[in-house]
């Protein structure tokens, strides 16, 4: 189609699935996994009303992460303890599911603080913890090391809410003897104001950034 070609990013694995959050079969749950760990930087909304997912990230995440879990349909906002405790439950389920591939490949084991979340959608509804947990093992077993345009379209579509089409971009540049790749996906339809609001933008690169 009219989307540019995208390539894989070294050190990143991705997968997406329908957790039936929309009850129509569309993909709505995504996992980004960094087997060797990854530095990350983040800009959150400045609103005083934030998702429990943001509260989790602020409390747990350090500079280095190993997994990002993104769900749509439910913003995990105004969910209180149910939403926050639910994230812990999901994180522990993910840790258990990752054990096999980490043991098989000699990866350092993921810890709770290595996992961050992003949630978008309706506010004030109970966070669908069980639906998400029930699809974690599928996400892990279907992680893709090689990401072509179709894979990137799949994950870009999985983070959408009211968007009319997925948003994604890719570029690469030669630095010395190395080709550095940068890929990005985003969601948001009139949602960037105020202060990022409910917009998501995820940018991945294999550049050596500390």
Segments predicted by a language model, with ranges:
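Basic, gly/Ser/Thr/Pro-rich low-complexity segments located predominantly at protein N termini
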Residues: 6, 16, 78, 85, ...
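Short, basic and Ser/Thr-rich N-terminal targeting/leader segments
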Residues: 25-27, 50, 153, 167
